[in-house]
């Protein structure tokens, strides 16, 4: 494990305007995972460990941050997991594209249960998942699919997405609404959680490439704009967008996550950095990787910690507030 102390002064050195009142003194640490794992998504687990998808090794990875040790749980033949989240049952739920199924891993027994997609959707290219307030899992598939799994009954339903290919990130708002973004389709979507119908919302301008989405505590939707290097905020009630450009990046805004204090975390492929955006002061702070080509594709956190997967370096990264 490698630790680096970082502060907002690093952001100032990059020419950013970070307000001193919102500056974050932080410790950045890195944890190596097995070579060739290509960790794609992460999920801080209830027991203090961290789950990650070892995409190129067909496994769910488990990191113990106290010891730095990792464990891999094989998900099945030809597995190629993408996303992982913590379910209401405290289990790991995975979008498992290789087997075209949603996978559940019991953290106690390590048992793997698969929920295959309907045969009408044979190659969804599963991406990301979220749970609604009723305990139903909703998922996206980049080949033009979105759907849901009822863990109680095991029933899996899927629908064709508007405008075909592109569904990517997905989120649940505090009031239980479910939204996803379409990278190739260049729009965001609200799902009717009863009927499964999809209602499209256009971005503030064409060609932004919405990649991931997260809701804050007020129900505002924060969206990473991959093609333009911007972060957008959509107010579903007022139907109004606001947009902020990432400093010095014309493209490459990938992952997004809003923490328990409504601070917005992003990853910037162009700057090879994790970014923190304070909506109150409208300022950015930068936490660049110590290695080239980090390629952090997804981030999640718990109070005081922001975790990401450096798919390009076979490491997990955590930013801890000091």
What are these regions (language model features)?
Residues 59-61, 100-104, 145-148, 187-190, ...:
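A short loop-to-beta-strand structural motif that recurs across blades of beta-propeller domains
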Residues 51-56, 92-99, 137-143, 179-184, ...:
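Conserved beta-strand positions in repeat-built beta-propeller and related beta-rich domains
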Residues 32-33, 73-75, 115-118, 159-162, ...:
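Short loop/turn motifs that cap or connect beta-strands within the blades
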Residues 64-68, 106-110, 150-154, 192-196, ...:
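Short loop/turn segments that connect beta-strands within beta-propeller blades
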Residues 7-19:
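Bacterial N-terminal signal peptides
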Residues 35-46, 76-89, 120-134, 163-175, ...:
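Beta-rich, blade/repeat-based domains predominating
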Residues 293-322:
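Blade-level signature of beta-propeller repeat domains, shared across WD40, Kelch, NHL, RCC1
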Residues 24-35:
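A short helix->beta-strand "capping" segment at the edge of beta-propeller domains
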